[in-house]
Each structure stands twice: as structure tokens, then as C-alpha cells.
Amino acid sequence: MASRRKSTTPCMVLASEQDPDLELISDLEEGPPVLTPVENARAESVSSDEEVHESVDSDNQQNKKVEGGYECKYCTFQTPDLNMFTFHVDSEHPNVVLNSSYVCVECNFLTKRYDALSEHNLKYHPGEENFKLTMVKRNNQTIFEQTINDLTFDGSFVKEENTEQGESIDVSSSGISISKTPIMKMMKNKVENKRITVHHNSAEGTSEEKENGVKASREENAENTSSSASESNTSTSTVNQVHPSPAGTVVTPTAVLPGLAQVITAVSAQQNSNLVPKVLIPVNSIPTYNAALDNNPLLLNTYNKFPYPTMSEITVLSAQAKYTEEQIKIWFSAQRLKHGVSWTPEEVEEARRKQFNGTVHTVPQTITVIPTHISTGSNGLPSILQTCQIVGQPGLVLTQVAGANTLPVTAPIALTVAGVPNQTNVQKSQVPAAQPAAETKPATAAVPSSPSVRPEAALVNPDSFGIRAKKTKEQLAELKVSYLKNQFPHDSEIIRLMKITGLTKGEIKKWFSDTRYNQRNSKSNQCLHLNNDSSATIIIDSSDETPEPPAAAASQPKQSWNPFPDFAPQKFKEKTAEQLRVLQASFLNSSVLTDEELNRLRAQTKLTRREIDAWFTEKNKTKALKDEKVEVDESNVGSSKEEPGENSPGDEAVAPKSAGTGKICKKTPEQLHMLKSAFVRTQWPSPEEYDKLAEESGLARTDIVSWFGDTRYAWKNGNLKWYYYYQSSNSSSLNGLSSLRKRGRGRPKGRGRGRPRGRPRGGKRMNTWDRVPSLIKFKTGTAILKDYYLKHKFLNEQDLDELVNRSHMGYEQVREWFAERQRRSELGIELFEENEEEDEVIDDQEEDEEETDDSDTWEPPRHVKRKLSKSDD
């Protein structure tokens, strides 16, 4: 026993040497060496670690028991410690491999290299991946026999036993593993078999090696060779546990690359279920099963929609797919067995009812959870992952892929799936430390009803369903701040908002567009400057704002009266006297509606948010109109001291007086002149133009923005009388005519115009800047119509729109005016009233008049002469 046999045939050779006479001999009768069970070994190279185990277990010539220790074949290293010997072989002889041969039974192909076998499979068995390798010993040489296996319903392969003349090794007791440096590992069976993965990837010529820790018993157990049921931490991949089955070893179809863990979908089962053997039925045992149906897209699509078709659906499928109903029924049954779908009749009816009443909308979800550190690797990853497919169920149960040095069986992860989301964040549970195999529970996939569902585990993008998602308060706050800065954001601002809010570019642009539209079309578009509080709320859609309880609102006392209501004013139900009293009291207290006050009014009056907001909007509008009327009256009384051009509706709408808003400064004539001139140039200034106006006029930028908004609104409603005057003066200055002196109508060329009476001679001319507002006289609407009538003598319908815009009169008013002229013409009476003609002459005179100091003569204007002549008569 202790003597060392001399052998001329080495058991281990370098990878560069390929000697066909090399052989691997297993002498079980000598008894294995005394080994210390390896637990918590280091997680090093799989190939290197397995080489040592192979060399120790399977070949006594390589490592003989030398005084209770181990001796290296290629150097003088000796040690009694297996771990030390393992480390030595890994570090000093990394290229040591075992001698083996490979035989393809189907083609009778023999080779010494695994790469050659892979090339053979790629050439003669293209697309075939269901290979089975059986290890036998023949003539003191280890041989791998490759056959093509049959697929069972659960996706596993049945591996037959091949024995050779009593020298072969029982396959059920052997764990077969292959890597790029092929190494055989012979293990003994103790209590239960291991479910091991062998997978050939023909493109890469690789397969994965499943390694189990080896324990050797003492001499009294030499007769009954065994393998420990517990796995050591040297395992870099995970194995599904199956229970004792004397029929043979079950090999799963899924294999993974080095360092890659197998995807396992698992839920806890009964602990005593490990006593029940798992029965695997080969597909070819069903005589009517037709494998051609597996690639039929119609059947696959139907199965994905619902795994239990009705008889009528089977009949339709039979007619469309050109297969018999019996074949289709068998195919659906096989698919359900294959994917582990087993529902009770009640569950089938419930799932069907949910599907047809709109609860279940989607095709089954296929979800694979892969750690980020291995999900980026290529290495044929998509083709070797076995995913878990859950059919017709709203709850999904899955576990994450186990990493290195871990076991895969964990508590299930439940999540809710609705539709096919673009973004799904799956919360992964932590994988616990390695547990003994005896405590591992078997895994089952596709549970019909999952009791534990965590909605927060899946974040679904609602855009994929066409549902408009509510914006959060943080998103709305960012959008409102940006809107107050610029109503037309640049691309850089949109990109910044996309990063901050997480919204899409289309959503952001639509929000800005809706806000501008609602602000422009709102009848309550009056800018209240609440002490320059830029935090005023802009409500675009009531669905974007979640009502808060009064207690929460009390801690945020910001002003939120909505100057831009989200919809046009609506007709609400009549309010009771008590409701009106409460609303009136609140309005008298403060015309600005805060969140706190709004919540209090909602609770007290039982009115909706929109009703209260609309009521306050209308009250503010009415109050602003009253204040404007009073101010106009005051300005008319003191017109000798004030400029009449300051009371245009577009200007008064800028700063309506309301209780609690503070003192709002009026704009000076110079400031108004600058704003009006800029408005004539463009109604939508750019941000740079706004800044320039603010710098030149001394007004706040928000005031200028508000003035332009209100003026645009007044212009749209035809309330801007000064617009055409500024437009004509702008066009004249652009054409270079502003410096030319105008002459009065009908005045002889040789006559000049004298200076007005009461003005000192030789005085300095008034500056045009100061003079323009006081000298502006506007033609009335009838004067414009009169000019048109004198020119054309009738109303041309093509010019109606232009006349309406210029005269600021309605369509019916213009038509009635021309009808009156026609009636007067037919009756032979005077076409125009005297005061109307006089006003028009005054307007023309004042419009054309320009003061000069170069005339020594003065004569009264024509309208004064006319009055004097009338008085003389």
C-alpha cells in the first residue's frame, strides 16, 4: 500500500504534450488516501482547483500516499496537507491537464482534443445543443461518449447509464464537467445525486463545469464510496437540488460560463417535499406529440396570451395551423408541463374573467434578474440563460442570479407587472450565506397566485400605456420656476429640466405650451405682483396638483391664487346664501386665495377647488374693472394736468388695485412710450429684449413681461387705440420720413403755419420724447369708416375684416354704419352728421400738425374759421 509503484506512463502531462498512449487509471481496490474534508476553500480558478481534485481522487499514480502525504509528479514537492498540495499545483503547474478521449457515438468520431469535438459538432451537428456526455473507462483510458439527448417536459435531459465490461464507472455516481482545459472529475455517491449542467456552445466551443466539494471517508468506508452532500465555497456556480432517483443522473439544459450563475426561479415548498422523487417524462414518449408545433408562431402567440385555450379556440387554431385538434391539445398540455403551469379550474376561470374584463392586458412576462457585474459580459449570455415565464398572472415571483461563492435559493421576490414597461426597477433581495444542501428547498416556477405582492418593486412608465402621468410637486416646482424666467425655453433649458425632473422633452414642451395657452386665453389674466413673490403657483392641470390636508398646508403659507386658470370659465351650480356669505367674507379679508384659505373654504362651503377659484377670479376681475373705471374718471377730471394717453385699457390692466396687494407704482409717460414702441415692433420680445427694456426703462422685468401679456390680450380684443398711431410713426421713421416736415391738407405751398397763440416767439421746441403722449389724437371708428366710404362709396366684403380691426368695431356695427349711409343717400339727406365731420377734421388737423418756429404769420385753423363763419351768419 505504502510502496510507490513505478510507471513509465505518466498520468498527467503538460497541455503542449499530446501522447495517445497516456491513460487514466482508477484503482479503487487500494483505497483512497486519507483526506481532510475541504470546507470554505479558497475561490480560485475552477480549472486549477478541479485539476487537483481529479488528480487526487481519480489517479493514484499521480498522487500516491507517501507517509500520509502527497507528492508532485513533476517536481520534488511533498506535503501531507491537501490544501498545500492543491496550492502548489495551481501555482507551479497551471497547464497540467488530464488525458482523455472524446467519441461522438452518432458519427463514430474519435479525438483527443475537446476543441476538435466542438468543431465536429459545429460542422456535422449545426444548431444541435442537446448533447449528453457519458464518462467510461476502457483499456485504462478515460473516454467521453457524446450522444444526442431527448428533452423532457421540465426542460431537462435524461441521461442513460453506459457501462463497459465492469470497468466503466457508474454514471449516476459521476459528476461530469468540462471546461476549455478539459478536466474530468470522478465523484462517489453517498446519499443523493447532484443535478449537474452540461451545455455545449458550438459557437464558442465551450461548456460549463459544475463543481462539487469532495469528501473522502476513512478506510471503513472504502467499500461504499461516497460524496458529501454539502457544497464548499469553491463552487462558482449554483446547482438545482433534486432528490434521490435511482433511475440515473438528471442533467439540466442550461449551462453558464465561468463565474456566471444559473438563473433560478424559486419559491419555498414544503420541507418534506424533498422526500418525493421528481418524475421526468421524455417528450418522445407521447406518441401524438408533434415537435414541429414548437416553431409555429400562431400557437406560440396563443399560448403566450392564455395557456388554457377553450375548445372553440382549439378548433380555430386547428383550422389555421393545419394540425389536428388532438395534436394542438397535446401541444398545449406539454407546454404547460414544460413551463410548470398548473392551475385549478377555478383559477383558470378567474384568470380568463380578468383577461376579458380588462384586468389582464399583457402577454406573459419573461424576467431575468442578472447582477450588473456579469450582465455586461457577452460570452453567449442570451443563449444560455433559462428564464422564468409567468403566464397570465399579475404577480411575478423571481430570485436574482447568484454570484460567486453563494447559493441561489433565497426568499422569493414578488413584484407587480402591468403592461410591458419601458423602465422596470426590480428590487433584489440579498442572497444569504451558503447553506447546507439538506436545508435547500426545491424550486418551482410560475406560481398561479402569489400572496405577497409588493407594488413598489416595479416602477412602470405610464407613457407606454398612453396614460398621462401626474407630475409630482417637485417636477411642477421646477417647471414653474423655469416658466417664470422664460415662457419659451431654449434647448439647453429643456435638457436641464429633463435631467432634473425626469420628464421627456415632449412632456416639458407640452407643459410650457399649455401654460402659455391658458395664460393667453384666460379672462382673468391680470398680473398680481404679490410683493415680488415669485413662488406663486401656476396651476396648469388640476390633476397635477394633489390636495393637501389643512395641517400640511398651514406649514407652507405661500400665495397660490391662480392667475392662469387651467380651463375657460365654467357654469357652476348656484351657490347658497351661506356659501356666498363665507366666500364674500374671505374675499373682503384678502382677495388673494392661498392654499390654506382654499382648503378651509372647501371644508366649510363644500364647494370644489375649481368653483372657489373661479369665484375669486371673477371677483378680482370685477374689482379690477371698477378700479380702472374710477381711475379713468379721475384722470378725465384732471386732464389738463395729466396725459390722456396713460389710461389705455392695456396699461390699466397691468396693475389693478386690490386689497392686500400693496402700493403699485404707475408707469411714467416715457416708460409707456418705450413699451408701446417695443410692442409695435414685436408682440413677443425675446429674453434679451426683455432685459434691454428693463435696463432702459428702469422697470422690473416681471412688470414688463406682465405688461406685454396684458397688452397682447387687449390687442386681441380690440382695445388698443394707440397701436396704429405708433405703427404709422414707426413705419415713417423706418422709411426715413420722420425728419420731413408735414404740411396741412389743402394749404398752399407758399404758406407756412404760424405758431399757436400764447406761445412765446423764439422759444425752444419741445422734445419729441416729452411731446408725443400729449399730442396723440386718435381717429374714431366712424372716421375710419368715413374715409373708406368716401373712397369706395360702398362696403366691399373683402375689406370687412380690415375695417373691423382698424375701427375696433364689430362686424354688425360696421355693416349697420354702411347701411345707414346707404339709407341716407337714398333719402337725399346729409350722409354724415355735423359733429362727426368736425371731430374727423380735428383729428386730421392734429395728426398732421407739426409745430414750427419759422413762420411770422399765424391764422386760425380751418375748423375755427368755420365756427366763426357760422356765428357771423
UniProtKB/Swiss-Prot annotation:
Biased composition (Low complexity): 223-238, 551-560
Compartments (UniProt record): Nucleus
Tissues of expression: Ubiquitously expressed.
Basic residues bias: start-end ranges: 740-764, 863-873
Modified residues (Phosphoserine): S45, S47, S48, S202, S648, S774
Modification type Phosphothreonine: residues: T36
GO molecular function: DNA binding; DNA-binding transcription factor activity; DNA-binding transcription factor activity, RNA polymerase II-specific; protein heterodimerization activity; zinc ion binding
Region (Required for nuclear localization) residue spans: 734-768
Cited Gene3D superfamilies: Classic Zinc Finger, Homeodomain-like
Ranges where the record places region Required for repressor activity: 831-873
Signal peptide feature range: none
Domain of life: Eukaryota
The entry's keywords: DNA-binding, Homeobox, Isopeptide bond, Metal-binding, Nucleus, Phosphoprotein, Repeat, Repressor, Transcription, Transcription regulation, Ubl conjugation, Zinc, Zinc-finger
Listed GO CC annotations: nucleus
Sequence segments annotated as region (Required for interaction with NFYA): 272-564
Upregulation: Not induced by gonadotropins.
Segments of this protein annotated with the region Disordered: 1-63, 198-247, 430-455, 540-568, 627-664, 731-767, 829-873
Zinc finger residue extent: C2H2-type: 70-93, 102-125
PANTHER family: ZINC FINGERS AND HOMEOBOXES PROTEIN 1, ZINC-FINGERS AND HOMEOBOXES RELATED
Quaternary structure and partners: Forms homodimers. Heterodimer (via HD1 domain) with ZHX2 (via HD1 domain). Also forms a heterodimer with ZHX3 which is a prerequisite for repressor activity. Interacts with ATF7IP and NFYA. Interacts (via homeobox domains) with DNMT3B (via PWWP domain).
Role summary: Acts as a transcriptional repressor. Increases DNMT3B-mediated repressive transcriptional activity when DNMT3B is tethered to DNA. May link molecule between DNMT3B and other co-repressor proteins.
Family according to the record: Belongs to the ZHX family.
Name recorded for this polypeptide: Zinc fingers and homeoboxes protein 1
Species: Rattus norvegicus
Gene designation: Zhx1
